[in-house]
Amino acid sequence: GSVADLDGDGRYEIVLKWEPSNAKDNAHGGYTGNVYIDAYKFDGTFMWRIDLGPNIRAGAHYTQFMVYDLDGDGQAEIVMKTADGTIDGEGNVIGDPNADYRNNNGYVLSGPEYLTVFHGLTGKALATIDYEPPRGNVAAWGDSYGNRVDRFLAGIAYLDGVRPSVIMAR
């Protein structure tokens, strides 16, 4: 989870990642349920939910999200890797709503990957681009089942000394 001022009122809200009970480490095969990112006010009032859909596997290494005021407007944005079938906080679908890239072992080793910035107040997808670096040939990362290609890290850095930049790593 994370905290940030999502609505610009000067108080923190809470952003939580919910994983299903069948989440898997990427060293273990098997289908998983969907991952959800929820926002709440500190009094427990629900704000919005992002459903990452079937093409983001549930497990410790798959979804790293950042919560930070990237544009300096006093409201934090949320940034994370998404895929076809992700549903934003307003019910809008990113990419193909019917796509399911899971293989017979439950891994998602093909299909498009995106990086999406979401509005902190509403959970609405503001911008989506292709995720870099791309997955490419899974075996080129050192194994063929996705243990290395599907490990992600995230951070915020002031690369120019003035503005925050999102750092995503595979």
Regions inferred by a protein language model and the residue ranges of each:
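Beta-propeller-forming repeat regions
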Residues: 1-170
